[in-house]
Curated annotation (Swiss-Prot):
Binding partners and assembly: May interact with SETX. Monomer and homooligomer. Binds RNA as a monomer and oligomerizes when bound to poly(A). Interacts with PAPOLA, but only in presence of oligo(A) RNA. Interacts with transportin. Identified in a IGF2BP1-dependent mRNP granule complex containing untranslated mRNAs. Association in a ternary complex with CPSF4 and influenza A virus NS1 blocks pre-mRNAs processing, thereby preventing nuclear export of host cell mRNAs. Associates in a single complex with SKIP and MYOD1 and interacts with SKIP in differentiated myocytes. Interacts with NUDT21/CPSF5.
Primary role: Involved in the 3'-end formation of mRNA precursors (pre-mRNA) by the addition of a poly(A) tail of 200-250 nt to the upstream cleavage product. Stimulates poly(A) polymerase (PAPOLA) conferring processivity on the poly(A) tail elongation reaction and also controls the poly(A) tail length. Increases the affinity of poly(A) polymerase for RNA. Is also present at various stages of mRNA metabolism including nucleocytoplasmic trafficking and nonsense-mediated decay (NMD) of mRNA.
Protein name: Polyadenylate-binding protein 2
Miscellaneous field: The association of the expanded polyalanine mutations together with the capability to oligomerize may induce intranuclear inclusions and cell death. Expanded polyalanine mutations may either result from unequal crossing over during germ cell homologous recombination or from DNA slippage. The pathogenic mechanisms mediated by polyalanine expansion mutations may be either a general disruption of cellular RNA metabolism due to the trapping by the inclusions of PABPN1, mRNAs and/or nuclear proteins, resulting in the induction of cell death; or may change the normal muscle cell differentiation.
Residues covered by region (Disordered): 1-115
Length: 306
């Protein structure tokens, strides 16, 4: 009995302690609906006291609750390269620094504000130069077209004549042989001036050396002048006795070696005279035309002095 009383007293003392946050109080409904606290001699109180004493170490072990670990923030999706960045109020770590860095470059009044106008000025100058180059090309093309369409007077190209026209011109022309190498077209025109109106004087020259060959052709305005000029055959011109005969029309396949020399390669200095007796010198404007048959002693060619 003494042991039971001591246990009840211990249970009452334990029940009389201050109720801490880590202690439990077991209520067992009694006859009056509630069990009395620390009532000595009660069986229910005794059982509760033993249970409290037995559970007290477990409660002390479970009393410190571990702090909840902070939840890891899920990785934020990266924005595509062209998408705008987060705003100033997003609160994302590092966003403010990323926004501040370009802000420093944009707000820098040193280089950025000076380079933009200079760059624009350079681009404008390049555009102007390109436009000027295009205009120059257009002008050059127009000038070339005009030159091709209308050659300048006094330097007209060789006129292509039909066979009938060539025969008619040859009928009004004479051949002058043994002409002095230093003679000019003006001197020949003056020598035959009394025979009639002279349209053209052609002095043939060597193709390679450019030296005169010693004969010429003179074209008159009419056939009557040709007959008159034959009277100057074997006359003296610059100390030489010249030979004057009517010019013959040469055709392909007809030999022209009766005058003692091949006539396949030559240059011609031609001077034209119009009806008002004014004259101009066209230079070496004739091209040799002919066929040379190799392996034979004679050459056959078609010769056109005009």
């Amino acid at each position: 009995m003494a042991a039971a009383a001591a246990a009840a007293a211990a249970a009452g003392a334990a029940g009389g302690r201050g109720s801490g946050p880590g202690r439990r109080r077991h209520l067992v409904p009694g006859a009056g609906g509630e069990a009395g606290e620390g009532a000595p001699g009660g069986a229910g109180d005794y059982g509760n006291g033993l249970e409290s004493e037995e559970l007290e170490p477990e409660e002390l072990l479970l009393e410190p609750e571990p702090e909840p670990e902070p939840e890891e923030e899920p990785p934020r999706p990266r924005a595509p390269p062209g998408a705008p960045g987060p705003g100033p109020g997003s609160g994302a770590p590092g966003s403010q620094e990323e926004e501040e860095e370009p802000g420093l470059v944009e707000g820098d009044p040193g280089d950025g504000a000076i380079e933009d106008p200079e760059l624009e000025a350079i681009k404008a100058r390049v555009r102007e130069m390109e436009e000027e180059a295009e205009k120059l090309k257009e002008l050059q093309n127009e000038v070339e077209k005009q030159m091709n369409m209308s050659p300048p007077p006094g330097n007209a190209g060789p006129v292509i004549m039909s066979i009938e026209e060539k025969m008619e011109a040859d009928a009004r022309s004479i051949y002058v042989g043994n002409v002095d190498y230093g003679a000019t077209a003006e001197e020949l025109e003056a020598h035959f001036h009394g025979c009639g109106s002279v349209n053209r004087v052609t002095i043939l020259c060597d193709k390679f050396s450019g030296h005169p060959k010693g004969f010429a052709y003179i074209e008159f305005s009419d056939k009557e002048s040709v007959r008159t000029s034959l009277a100057l055959d074997e006359s003296l011109f610059r100390g030489r006795q010249i030979k004057v005969i009517p010019k013959r029309t040469n055709r392909p396949g007809i030999s022209t070696t009766d005058r003692g020399f091949p006539r396949a390669r030559y240059r011609a200095r031609t001077t034209n005279y119009n009806s008002s007796r004014s004259r101009f010198y066209s230079g070496f404007n004739s091209r040799p035309r002919g066929r040379v048959y190799r392996g034979r002693a004679r050459a056959t060619s078609w010769y056109s002095p005009y």
